[in-house]
Amino acid sequence: MASLMLNGAITFPKGLGSPGSNLHARSIPRPTLLSVTRTSTPRLSVATRCSSSSVSSSRPSAQPRFIQHKKEAYWFYRFLSIVYDHVINPGHWTEDMRDDALEPADLSHPDMRVVDVGGGTGFTTLGIVKTVKAKNVTILDQSPHQLAKAKQKEPLKECKIVEGDAEDLPFPTDYADRYVSAGSIEYWPDPQRGIREAYRVLKIGGKACLIGPVYPTFWLSRFFSDVWMLFPKEEEYIEWFKNAGFKDVQLKRIGPKWYRGVRRHGLIMGCSVTGVKPASGDSPLQLGPKEEDVEKPVNNPFSFLGRFLLGTLAAAWFVLIPIYMWIKDQIVPKDQPI
């Protein structure tokens, strides 16, 4: 969730933001496929709360980032899990934001089978089990430390807990009614592959709901996001969903209510993207081998340490932003933009 707090650029009726969690880990081998080239540019489809134009900034398509290996993300969350629910979520992923972001997922029936990919400490899962029976929900994450926190939450006692890789899900094809992933895409080396997997595991007519950050416009936030992890553009989310085969793709902007007017400063923007699986079976999109072997160790421990420290500095920036904006919200009259 921490990663949501740094983007946006115009004023919307509701705020925006994003969750923070992780996923990946032990992968289950799947057949290697060949890559294909797509030449058409998908049209941006946006929900009614969102203007049709994107306010995200441009960035290099292959921009390197701080956490480039899932093992590094594993260690990052080894320590973040200690304070995640009490320090990160209050400023970046509130209960109101969570419920607002999950609304497009249509979690309308208690007997739905739901997978929460990158579920982490289970904060997003707590929103899911408000309407879906816990025994029908599976929480998947690469971090055993995050999952240990989820196991301690009473409403989640009946949920299935799985260590796994978002880009190689340990579920059969046509398995779930709903796929939810909040604050995980930031750590995916290949987001298109992860969304393709979302398509595969859903039943026909099933819906995927992916919640994540959007690339910022504020220059300092752009700098930290470029060196830290993945912050997609709104149109990239739409394209990835459509490439995977999803129909009725919608995007909804989300954020904390007390971020009044700050989008004009380019500080924050997050989104909830949904798509419906139109046919049973695997995704029509074919991809080559995975870019990253999660079983491989980190190549250079000194390089890893340097990137880890730099990423910690970037994370500190994202923690300070909501504190600053909360103070301004208390000072500035409610009828004036911040």
UniProtKB/Swiss-Prot annotation:
Q: Where is this region: SAM motif III?
A: 200-213
The UniProt entry lists the main location of this chain as plastid
One Gene Ontology cellular component annotation held by this UniProt entry: cytosol
Name the phenotypic consequences of knocking out this gene.
Answer: Pale green seedlings that are lethal when grown on normal conditions.
User: Which reactions appear under catalytic activity for this entry?
Assistant: 2-methyl-6-phytyl-1,4-benzene-1,4-diol + S-adenosyl-L-methionine = 2,3-dimethyl-6-phytylbenzene-1,4-diol + S-adenosyl-L-homocysteine + H(+); 2-methyl-6-(all-trans-nonaprenyl)benzene-1,4-diol + S-adenosyl-L-methionine = plastoquinol-9 + S-adenosyl-L-homocysteine + H(+); 6-geranylgeranyl-2-methylbenzene-1,4-diol + S-adenosyl-L-methionine = 6-geranylgeranyl-2,3-dimethylbenzene-1,4-diol + S-adenosyl-L-homocysteine + H(+)
Which stretches of sequence are listed as region SAM motif II? Answer: 159-172
Q: Which residues cross the membrane?
A: 308-328
- Quote one Gene Ontology molecular function term: 2-methyl-6-solanyl-1,4-benzoquinone methyltransferase activity
- Write down the superkingdom of origin: Eukaryota
Region annotation SAM motif I: where it falls in the sequence: 114-123
One Gene Ontology term of the biological-process aspect is: methylation
Question: Where can this protein be found?
Answer: Plastid, Chloroplast inner membrane
- Give the pathway: Cofactor biosynthesis; tocopherol biosynthesis
Q: Is Protein biosynthesis a UniProt keyword of this protein? A: no
Task: Look up keyword Plastid and say if it applies.
Answer: yes
In terms of CDD domains, this protein maps to: AdoMet_MTases (cd02440)
Q: What is its EC number?
A: 2.1.1.295
Membrane topology term reads:
Single-pass membrane protein
Its family? Belongs to the class I-like SAM-binding methyltransferase superfamily. MPBQ/MBSQ MT family.
Annotated protein name in UniProt: 2-methyl-6-phytyl-1,4-hydroquinone methyltransferase, chloroplastic
Gene name linked to the record = VTE3
